[in-house]
Amino acid sequence: MLLPRQFYARDVLIVAKDLLNCYLVREYNGHLLIGKIVETEAYHQNDPACHAYRGKTKRNEVMFGPPGHAYVYFTYGMHYCFNVVTGAIGRAEAVLIRALEPVKGIDIIKTLRGGKSERELLSGPAKLTQGLAIDLKLNGHDLTGGKILYITKGEPVAEEDIVVTTRIGINAGKDLPYRFYLKNNKYVSKK
C-alpha cells in the first residue's frame, strides 16, 4: 500500500521511526528498484544541523512543505542525499533515508553502483541515491503519486527492534538522538 500524505503530515521524529521497514520504490528504465528502509535520521527547523535552521532558501524550500515530497540535495560536490518532507506546511522538517536493504532489481542496482557487494549497495545516503538513480531531477517529487519514486507500507516494527542513537557526519546537533535503525540489520550504514 502506498503511503498517503497524512502519514507524512506528522512530527518528523515519529515519521522517521515509522518509515523503518517500509519500501522505497524507484521506477527506472522500465524496472522496479526496491529497497527496505533500515536506517533514518530526523531533521527539523529548530535543529542546528537542519538545512532550514537559518530560514527558507532556494535550496531548502521543498522542506517547508507540503509533506510527502522528496527533498534531494547535492553535497560535498559529488553526492546526492534523499529526504522525505514531513510535518505541517511551513514547519520545515525532513527525514534523511540513510540506508536500504536491497529487495528487487538488485542486478540493476549493482550496475548503477559499479558492481559493489550486496551489503555495500545501499548502505549509506550517497550509496542509495546512486543505486536507485536519484538525483536533483527528483527534488520536490510527490511521493504520494505512486509513480517514478514512492514509498509503500511495510510491517510495523516493535520498539525493542529499533535502535535510537545520535546522527552521523554532523557537528551541530550531533548529540541529539535523532537517528533510528533496525537492530541486527546488516545493511545499516554504521552501528
From Swiss-Prot:
Signal peptide: none annotated. It is an enzyme of class 3 (hydrolase). Keywords: DNA damage, DNA repair, Hydrolase. GO terms for molecular function: alkylbase DNA N-glycosylase activity; DNA binding. It holds the Pfam family Pur_DNA_glyco. One of its GO terms (biological process) is base-excision repair. It comes from the Bacteria. CDD domains: AAG. InterPro entries: Formyl_transferase-like_C_sf (IPR011034), MPG (IPR003180), MPG_sf (IPR036995). Its EC number is 3.2.2.-. Belongs to the DNA glycosylase MPG family. This is Putative 3-methyladenine DNA glycosylase. It comes from Carboxydothermus hydrogenoformans (strain ATCC BAA-161 / DSM 6008 / Z-2901). The lineage of its organism: Bacteria, Bacillati, Bacillota, Clostridia, Thermoanaerobacterales.
